[in-house]
């Protein structure tokens, strides 16, 4: 139904207008008390082979919603009802900012991809805190992706990340330190090993300082870009590990454009979707080797099928996330991926998802 009816209608709209319309509808659905729980009864993953516990939290599925789709936490209950094992909101900055000028989001249907140059448009940490506090009954863990404001120089970036943690710690089940978006000038420079280690330590210190006040100690993950030179990637992974972070997300959008066919392939911004499938899996495998399996890895990039997700798990990911595929495949995608992933495990005689992690090294 989505591919035949809804997607053609949405794809006639400007991509960002379609995004806002969809979020508004899901936000309204989230406000209906019985709707999310009713839908989740139909879509929630039930195969125990997919369930795992990480950082003291239970994930009913390894499949999560990646950051960027629900920046301000407007539709968390609705996304949780679709069959995701967790939902990542943001990127959020301490202070609200409008992001880059429109148009800033582009579909590339022939490549099953998106290009965005959004620029961390969001309502700010205080607004997100209010939204998440209102969703007191959460069907799944909610992660918060944090970044620095555009006007904040890199030398002061640490304070922005710390401020975001202070405001949001009580409502975050995990923090994701975003230093890899290509759409905020200078942000990716924070991936340099020395700067990254200092930033991660500062965020961990802030989380520890807020532990008594919030009665929570959310894990801290770091999201890296897929465009790093191999030596820089190795140094950044080492810095994250040495600083004591709790996990890695591999990776963000790419500036590469190899193999694209759509006329809008030259738009400035980060590319996501099908063109990243192989590259992101390769980087998950590299990160798993570098960490020797000591740090949970979340694989992101080009996941459209259960086979795509399974490949990342076998490369070393404990969890995976989707975004672009949801735009192309629709709201039935999470439940379908969960069912198909369980079938793949059964086909291979895998008793539990964790047995498949890293087997393809």
Swiss-Prot record:
Entry's localization field: Cell membrane
What residues make up the catalytic site? 181
What is written in the cofactor note of this entry?
Answer: Binds 1 FMN per subunit.
Q: Which reaction does it catalyse?
A: (S)-dihydroorotate + a quinone = orotate + a quinol
Q: Which residues bind FMN?
A: 67-71, 91, 145, 178, 223, 251, 273, 302, 323-324
Its annotated pathway?
Answer: Pyrimidine metabolism; UMP biosynthesis via de novo pathway; orotate from (S)-dihydroorotate (quinone route): step 1/1
Which GO BP terms, alphabetically? Answer: 'de novo' pyrimidine nucleobase biosynthetic process; 'de novo' UMP biosynthetic process
PANTHER family xrefs: DIHYDROOROTATE DEHYDROGENASE (QUINONE), MITOCHONDRIAL (PTHR48109:SF4), DIHYDROOROTATE DEHYDROGENASE (QUINONE), MITOCHONDRIAL-RELATED (PTHR48109)
Summarize the protein's role: Catalyzes the conversion of dihydroorotate to orotate with quinone as electron acceptor.
This protein's name? Dihydroorotate dehydrogenase (quinone)
Provenance organism = Deinococcus geothermalis (strain DSM 11300 / CIP 105573 / AG-3a)
Task: Name the gene that codes for it.
Answer: pyrD
């Amino acid at each position: 139904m989505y591919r035949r009816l809804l997607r053609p209608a949405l794809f006639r709209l400007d991509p960002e207008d379609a995004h806002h319309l969809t979020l508004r509808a899901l936000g309204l659905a989230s406000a209906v008390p019985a709707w999310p729980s009713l839908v989740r009864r139909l879509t929630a993953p039930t195969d125990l082979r997919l369930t795992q516990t990480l950082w003291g939290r239970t994930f009913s599925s390894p499949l999560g919603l990646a950051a960027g789709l629900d920046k301000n936490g407007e539709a968390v209950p609705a996304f949780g009802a679709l069959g995701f094992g967790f939902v990542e909101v943001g990127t959020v900055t301490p202070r609200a900012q409008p992001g880059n000028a429109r148009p800033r989001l582009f579909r590339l249907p022939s490549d099953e991809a998106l290009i965005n140059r959004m620029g961390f448009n969001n309502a700010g940490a205080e607004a997100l805190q209010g939204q998440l506090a209102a969703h007191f009954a959460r069907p799944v863990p909610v992660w918060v992706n944090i970044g620095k404001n555009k006007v904040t120089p890199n030398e002061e970036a640490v304070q922005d990340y710390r401020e975001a943690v202070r405001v949001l710690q009580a409502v975050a089940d995990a923090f994701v330190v975003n230093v890899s978006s290509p759409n905020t000038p200078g942000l990716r420079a924070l991936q340099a090993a020395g700067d990254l280690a200092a930033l991660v330590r500062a965020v961990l210190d802030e989380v520890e300082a807020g532990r008594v006040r919030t009665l929570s100690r959310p894990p801290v993950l770091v999201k890296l870009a897929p465009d790093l030179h191999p030596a820089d990637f190795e140094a950044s992974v080492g810095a994250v590990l040495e600083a004591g972070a709790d996990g890695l997300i591999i990776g963000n959008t790419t500036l590469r454009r190899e193999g694209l066919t759509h006329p809008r392939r030259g738009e400035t911004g980060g590319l996501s979707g099908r063109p990243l499938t192989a590259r992101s899996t390769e980087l998950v495998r590299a990160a798993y080797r570098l960490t020797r399996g000591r740090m949970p890895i979340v694989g992101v990039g080009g996941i459209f099928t259960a086979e795509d997700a399974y490949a990342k798990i076998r490369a070393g990911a404990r969890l995976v996330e989707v975004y672009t595929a949801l735009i192309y495949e629709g709201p039935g995608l999470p439940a379908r991926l969960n069912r198909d992933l369980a079938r793949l495990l059964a086909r291979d005689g895998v008793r539990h998802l964790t047995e498949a992690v890293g087997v393809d090294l």
